Amino acid sequence: MQIKTFALSAAIAQVATLALADTSANYWQSFTSQINPKNISIPSIEQTSSIDPTQECAYYTPDASLFTFNASEWPSIWEVATTNGMNESAEFLSVYNSIDWTKAPNISVRTLDANGNLDTTGYNTATDPDCWWTATTCTSPKISDINDDISKCPEPETWGLTYDDGPNCSHNAFYDYLQEQKLKASMFYIGSNVVDWPYGAMRGVVDGHHIASHTWSHPQMTTKTNQEVLAEFYYTQKAIKLATGLTPRYWRPPYGDIDDRVRWIASQLGLTAVIWNLDTDDWSAGVTTTVEAVEQSYSDYIAMGTNGTFANSGNIVLTHEINTTMSLAVENLPKIISAYKQVIDVATCYNISHPYFEDYEWTNVLNGTKSSATASGSATSASASGGATTAAAHIQASTSGAMSVLPNLALISAFIATLLF
């Protein structure tokens, strides 16, 4: 029955992907890109080949045959996505006006308290009318026609490998290590980082990672107006398409801050949220907490791979692609691989065959990651561990320096029935 349960979850995920395809006049088809995602050739320059952060993070002008960025057509980098007049541009207004805003949930824009934290004062956490994750960690919307957030991998003893905030200019050693270990992750890219470091985004696709959206400027999304929320989504989608030739169907809210208003707006662009059920808090190491505390979180979560915690389903773990966290990831990945049967990206763990709007089929498979990434025999295991140590040392230096078709519902029902019975 466990196999059937997973198969059902995967089937539902695939159906949901298809069901959200025809939204807002297929806005993504208006995006342009000079990139063929099935055949990307990244220029060999110091920034793409070096593992010295100083060289990696030196500004470069992208090859015009691959990536052309006209600043007048984009929001200001790292500012809310309606800046630079984008909320008044014909391009954005075309998408905004294609949405029937009378159907949007009547949920107020959230505010911050004096300390800059989301103010949950007065919110009814018992009834949680808005499915506000920040207040209650709710992942099942209270309104219809919106997908549930994805928050865990359905397959038992599975580590859902995800990294936020990329592409980071100093990620070469980290991506090299993932490639050596044949590990694929869900990479949640920030639009501003994509246009700053387009070759980094291209590498994510070349290496076979699942690319998803993490907004344009990394705001607390429930504090933004409807226009601002839509713009954060829209321009991140446009940026990822420009740099990679692909438009994601999945996104992750910064800080996990999402409610049914934000979900509804995301759904108008065919986007489904991916949350997590374990948080390493890795970004805070040496900032608001100690490195030792983050290492303990890793150790606790690694132990869960063998102590029965995930005997019936897996996890999705929040980690980050930033200067202070990539070395922690590399140090812990060999132990994660040893403790879990699967270490895989979200698209694979949910058996999502088309994680992008374009005709680009996902071919990563269950059980493929660990068998190829885990050493068989003590000698090879030692080699894998050594590789982790070497990569971590390099990364540590940076801390100091398609056409979519709606499914036939009768066929879907019949298929799910065969899984259940």
From Swiss-Prot:
SUPFAM superfamilies: Glycoside hydrolase/deacetylase (SSF88713). Keywords: Carbohydrate metabolism, Cell membrane, Cell wall, Cell wall biogenesis/degradation, Chitin degradation, Chitin-binding, Cobalt, Glycoprotein, GPI-anchor, Hydrolase, Lipoprotein, Membrane, Metal-binding, Polysaccharide degradation, Secreted, Signal. It is a lipid-anchor; GPI-anchor. Its cofactor is Co(2+). It is found in: Secreted, Cell wall; Cell membrane. Co(2+) binds at residues 165, 214, 218. GO terms for molecular function: chitin binding; chitin deacetylase activity; metal ion binding. Residues 157-349 form the NodB homology domain. PROSITE patterns: NODB. Coiled coil: none annotated. A lipid is attached at residue 390 (GPI-anchor amidated threonine). GO terms for cellular component: extracellular region; plasma membrane; side of membrane. InterPro entries: Glyco_hydro/deAcase_b/a-brl (IPR011330), NODB_dom (IPR002509), Polysacc_deacetylase_ArnD (IPR050248). Hydrolyzes the N-acetamido groups of N-acetyl-D-glucosamine residues in chitin to form chitosan and acetate. This is Chitin deacetylase. The lineage of its organism: Eukaryota, Fungi, Fungi incertae sedis, Mucoromycota, Mucoromycotina.
